[in-house]
């Protein structure tokens, strides 16, 4: 069984990352310890709580974000600082425009990157510690929250034969959920395992790129960017959907992707209503550790419109926000997730465990923001969340 002993005796760095010129917050910046696989990310307001073992207090604390210089400071210099605000500088590297000597176009860059996936991503078994969250919203009101601490085991990044069958094996450490998971509105959401669906959104792991030549010829190369001391190719596609891919120069590793589609698509009919897919937004980010790129975080937002079957009028909207943050990576792992510990393929709300407050108090989650406080306000109409976690 998985040990939770490592959750005890941790030290915490809390703060906010901002642009050093504009003072604007830096959302989804990667927080970490140099040379270690432990990490978290900032929220929409650039805020973070980072729980780390005390033996890391003499190591270097780091913040990385696309287009910015890497921020580094000894951990011990940040401990105990009230209202810690860290100003991160934009990259001062002079980046050439698209017309540069290497002459590669967007399609060629991505084709090389895809061909090098097995060089740049793990090809030996590995384990990841992760934090999963899904939030459901109906007609503008948040109705449910589920969070889980998970272990994820995978063999490698070899291209799967079936790109729609989960290759990773997931073990649940802790699960907590709000009362809203028993709401009548939950039937308007997919009742399957939503974490399994989220992992299948990893376009690099599951090679979701079209094979047709027209896809590659439609890609446009944008101005280069900068990340963690390296120049980055930026490739985009703007057609019926938007796609943006960041590829590290030299290794051709895909380090970050953004995808958005707003095309309406018929889905299903239920209780005198018909549903149409309205929006999908996906962000995938990778982090380098010991020469290989591992999943850092994945966010997926989706929206479905529900119409009256007879009048065709919009009745309400359902929205689902899913996030998976990887807290720590264990390369070349000899550990496995036993069949008895494996997550089942039905909804996580039916696999919840007794609430463990001490565990969650010391676990790296995505820090709540003002937006999250609106979520909490909606959910607590049925009682304090802490009480809901205990009773569900």
Predicted segments, located by residue:
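A short, solvent-exposed loop/turn motif at the edges and junctions
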Residues: 62-73
């Amino acid at each position: 069984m998985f040990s939770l002993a490592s959750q005890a005796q941790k030290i915490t760095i809390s703060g906010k990352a901002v642009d050093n010129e504009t003072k604007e917050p830096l959302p989804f910046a990667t927080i970490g310890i140099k040379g270690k696989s432990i990490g978290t990310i900032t929220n929409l307001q650039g805020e973070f709580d980072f729980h780390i073992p005390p033996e890391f207090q003499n190591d270097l604390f780091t913040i990385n974000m696309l287009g910015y210089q890497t921020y580094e400071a000894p951990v011990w210099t940040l401990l105990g600082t009230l209202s810690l605000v860290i100003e991160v500088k934009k990259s001062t590297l002079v980046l050439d425009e698209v017309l540069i000597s290497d002459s590669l176009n967007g399609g060629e860059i991505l084709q090389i990157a895809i061909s090098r996936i097995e060089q740049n991503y793990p090809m030996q078994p590995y384990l990841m510690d992760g934090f999963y969250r899904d939030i459901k919203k109906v007609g503008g009101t948040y109705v449910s929250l589920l969070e889980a601490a998970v272990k994820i085991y995978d063999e490698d990044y070899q291209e799967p034969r079936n790109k729609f069958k989960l290759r990773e094996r997931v073990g649940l450490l802790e699960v907590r959920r709000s009362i809203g998971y028993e709401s009548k509105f939950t039937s308007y959401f997919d009742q399957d395992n939503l974490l399994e669906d989220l992992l299948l959104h990893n376009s690099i792991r599951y090679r979701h790129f079209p094979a047709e030549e027209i896809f590659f010829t439609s890609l446009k190369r944008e101005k280069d960017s900068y990340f963690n001391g390296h120049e980055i190719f930026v490739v985009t596609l703007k057609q019926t959907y938007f796609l943006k891919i960041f590829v590290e120069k030299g290794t051709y590793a895909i380090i970050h992707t953004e995808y958005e589609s707003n095309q309406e698509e018929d889905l299903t009919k239920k209780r005198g209503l018909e549903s149409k897919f309205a929006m999908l937004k996906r962000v995938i980010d990778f982090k380098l550790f010991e020469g290989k790129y591992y999943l850092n975080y994945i966010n997926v937002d989706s929206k479905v419109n529900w119409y009256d079957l007879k009048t065709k009028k919009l009745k309400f909207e359902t929205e689902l926000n899913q996030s998976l943050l990887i807290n720590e990576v264990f390369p070349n792992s000899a550990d496995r997730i036993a069949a008895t510990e494996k997550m089942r393929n039905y909804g996580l709300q039916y696999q919840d465990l007794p609430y463990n407050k001490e565990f969650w108090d010391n676990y790296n989650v995505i820090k709540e923001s003002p937006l999250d406080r609106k979520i909490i306000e909606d959910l607590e109409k049925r009682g304090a969340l802490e009480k809901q976690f205990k009773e569900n």
